């Protein structure tokens, strides 16, 4: 790899068990606050378990969005550990939940559970990088995204104002990816 960026995983003794929420057509990044509408029984139970414990839940994307009952093989291994900020039960039996992504994480082993999904999760530390190189790359990414915003009328130009003020390279990448 040309760039001095690499990911480190914490020691396996730091692995913890968390409820897992498979997501359809959405990816949640660290530092992102987003409402989700949840209706599947296993997913609702995963949220209830998270609320009863420490409000932490592993958010991972499904490989195919139209599966109503995804199995371990249908779910990506990497996702975001998130905190449930608010949970609202709706009259139709579904749940509206507000979550905030906190850490990139990897599922270790299998996702298991009969009534809800849970898995052993390993937090991935942020990459170690050269500050000068990061500054140059960040500027290049911001310039490229600015061109993208000018060509794509679906993104409000004000987004560039908030992106220009982000100093953390991981947060910059996550914020830009969320707008793609």
Task: Cite the ranges covered by each PLM segment.
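N-terminal low-complexity, acidic/polar interaction/targeting segments
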Residues: 2-180
């Amino acid at each position: 790899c040309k760039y001095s960026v690499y990911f480190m995983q914490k020691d396996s003794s730091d692995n913890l068990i968390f409820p897992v929420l498979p997501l359809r057509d959405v990816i949640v990044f660290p530092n992102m606050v987003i409402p989700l509408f949840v209706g599947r029984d296993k997913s609702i139970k995963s949220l209830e378990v998270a609320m009863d414990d420490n409000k932490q839940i592993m958010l991972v994307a499904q490989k195919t969005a139209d599966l109503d009952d995804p199995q371990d093989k249908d779910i990506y291994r990497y996702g975001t550990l998130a905190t449930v900020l608010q949970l609202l039960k709706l009259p139709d039996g579904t749940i509206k939940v507000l979550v905030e992504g906190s850490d990139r994480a990897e599922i270790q082993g299998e996702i298991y559970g009969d009534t809800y999904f849970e898995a052993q999760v390993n937090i991935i530390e942020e990459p170690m990088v050269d500050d000068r190189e990061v500054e140059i790359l960040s500027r290049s990414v911001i310039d490229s995204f600015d061109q993208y915003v000018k060509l794509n009328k679906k993104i409000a130009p004000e987004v560039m104002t908030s992106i220009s003020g982000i100093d953390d390279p991981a947060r910059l990448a996550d914020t830009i990816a969320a707008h793609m």
